[in-house]
A protein has these predicted regions:
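S-adenosylmethionine-dependent methyltransferases
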Residues: 1-220
């Protein structure tokens, strides 16, 4: 397993007093499941089937890392296994990036669009699986990231091979976040042995509390 370096950071932003169903983090707003916009999507019958039922905290670990270490190339971004898409939404809002939000489950996109609307941005939706992402799909991508995307044994190879293709395609920065599941570390071992990179321990406290690890590869 790659060695972990642990860094602790604190998010000081406070949730809006006007809306207790929202959290604020690094300049974006994140709705709880009880927020009216999320309830409206659920009432419309959209039910994600691959764990896309909430905002996962590994996305916040990635946002915090990117906030502190902004890549030079950040115009075009791919959010792989996006779920509700908050990391890509943050990139669109913070940097004005063109974001492609990718997920195998089309039912996540109404939720993502609701979150994007709350933040005053939009992203391009792409229904796709990791193993189907081709090298040519990645050739114009500056940053590829994914939060909580390696949660099953059968995802280890597809995620690792997607990263292989991203590196071959010249993607500049790759960041994968996870609460340190064994499957994440198995994938990270495969990738770092082949391409280098590092696994960083990362922690947030404050408005969002989260602990996990980030696989970071710089390919510029």
């Amino acid at each position: 397993m790659p060695s972990s370096k642990t860094k602790k950071t604190t998010s000081k932003a406070k949730p809006s007093a006007a809306d207790k169903k929202l959290r604020r983090f690094r300049g974006v707003v994140m709705p709880y499941a009880g927020h009216k916009s999320i309830r409206a999507v659920r009432r419309a019958g959209h039910e994600p089937s691959i764990h896309g039922t909430k905002l996962w905290k590994s996305s916040c670990l990635i946002i915090d890392y990117l906030k502190k270490h902004p890549p030079k190339r950040r115009k075009r971004v791919l959010d792989a296994g996006c779920g509700w898409g908050i990391t890509g939404i943050w990139c669109a809002k913070e940097w004005g990036s063109k974001v492609v939000s990718m997920d195998a489950d089309p039912a996540v996109f109404p939720y993502l669009n609701a979150v994007a609307e709350l933040n005053g941005v939009s992203t391009e939706s792409w229904v796709q699986r990791f193993e189907k992402v081709r090298k040519k799909d990645l050739e114009n991508v500056d940053i590829l990231f994914g939060g909580d995307i390696c949660f099953w044994d059968e995802l280890v190879d597809p995620v690792a091979k997607m990263i292989d293709r991203a590196i071959d395609a010249g993607v500049g920065t790759i960041v994968i976040g996870d609460p340190e599941r064994p499957t994440f570390h198995e994938m990270a071992d495969k990738v770092t042995e082949k391409h280098g990179g590092e696994v960083l321990g990362w922690r947030l406290s404050g408005t969002v509390k989260a602990t996990g690890a980030l696989l970071v590869i710089h390919n510029d």
